[in-house]
Each structure stands twice: as structure tokens, then as C-alpha cells.
């Protein structure tokens, strides 16, 4: 994938649905974000530039390690990247678990473009304030 103008670092998208990854990538590139996409949590963990990721768009249900498990793994490693979860499942216990662990937002699929962009901007602002 060809990165566009780098406004803030990398926004990573982790979703096992290729159509969703492509749609989210197109939306974010049109908004001048540099993006990288991954089909699994394990693929994201192998990403050499993982420390450059400034926001993570993360599906809850993934093959292998799920999104909440990835969130825990990152936190345990001291990586405090803002996470915007997206899920087709409205399970409030999963939402509560993710939010208690520090997720920036928890959105339900289908995600409205404007809402997602607002949540990403808010997460990025919040992480800059905490830095």
C-alpha cells in the first residue's frame, strides 16, 4: 500500500475482513493518514514499525488472538497506543472490558466515516496531551 502524507505517524487497521480493511484504508488515506493494514493480531505484532503506530483501529473478533487479547499484550509490553475498537457484535461485557483497559473508543459496525474520523482525531489528541 502506498502511504499518503504522514500527518501524525501510522494509523494501523487490524481486521480479518479484507473488504473492511480496504474500505477503512481508503477512508483514512483520503483524510491524509498514513496507514498499514493487517489481517490478524499476530501479523500486527510482527510489524517492524509497530512503535511508530499512533492509533490502532482494531476489530474485536479476529482469528487466533482477538482484539482484547492484543490490547492486553500491548499494555503488558508498555505500548500505550490509542485503540479504537470496531465490532459487529454489541456485547457490552467485551465493550466494558476494552474501555476499562483504556480503549479510546468502541464503535459498532457498520461504522460511520465521520464518527470514525472524529474518534481517531480525539484519540490522537489525547495521546499527544499524555506524551
Kindly label every feature range from the protein language model:
Residues 1-12, 18-25, 40, 114-131:
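Non-catalytic signal-transmission and effector/linker regions of two-component phosphorelay proteins
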Residues 39-40, 66-69:
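Acidic catalytic/metal-coordinating carboxylates
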Residues 59, 87:
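Active-site residues of response regulator receiver
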Residues 37-55:
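Acidic, metal-coordinating helix/loop segments flanking the phosphotransfer/catalytic sites
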Residues 69, 90-105:
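Alpha4 helix (beta4-alpha4-beta5 surface) of REC/receiver domains from two-component response regulators
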Residues 109:
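A Lys-centered signature of the CheY-like receiver
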Residues 21, 63, 91:
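The feature encodes the CheY-like receiver
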Residues 68-79:
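Short amphipathic alpha-helix used as the core "switch/output" element in two-component signaling
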